[in-house]
């Protein structure tokens, strides 16, 4: 059970939660669990991520695979996040039903 909630244990904000959800897509939890603290130390929020160097982000995400795609998706989601109304997480780039359900459970108490 603890491992199942590992994303929630490592995040301090909704943005970090969404990044965690995106990183878990097609990736083992163990890999994501190692990477998130490093990623969030360097990029604690959407603004920091957007201002960061794309090549550095791509390199950091490389251990998860598909780093080019992940870096781009997280960047686009982060841009959406800054103007998001926080109603439906599917409005964010790259966040689907799983991410929206997770948001509703952990942040909207639905």
Identify the residue ranges that each predicted region occupies.
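Short, structured loop/turn "capping" segments at alpha-beta junctions
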Residues: 84-85, 99-102
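Cytochrome P450
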Residues: 9-10, 93, 107-108
């Amino acid at each position: 059970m603890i491992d199942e909630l590992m994303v929630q244990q490592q995040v301090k904000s909704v943005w970090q939660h969404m990044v965690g959800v995106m990183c878990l897509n097609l990736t083992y939890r163990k890999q994501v669990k190692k990477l998130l603290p490093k990623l969030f130390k360097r990029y604690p929020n959407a603004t920091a991520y957007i201002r960061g160097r794309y090549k550095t982000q791509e390199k950091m995400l490389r251990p998860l695979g598909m780093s080019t795609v992940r870096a781009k998706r997280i960047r686009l989601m982060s841009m959406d996040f800054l103007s998001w109304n926080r109603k439906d997480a599917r409005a964010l780039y790259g966040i689907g039903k799983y991410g929206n359900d997770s948001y509703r459970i952990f942040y909207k108490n639905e």
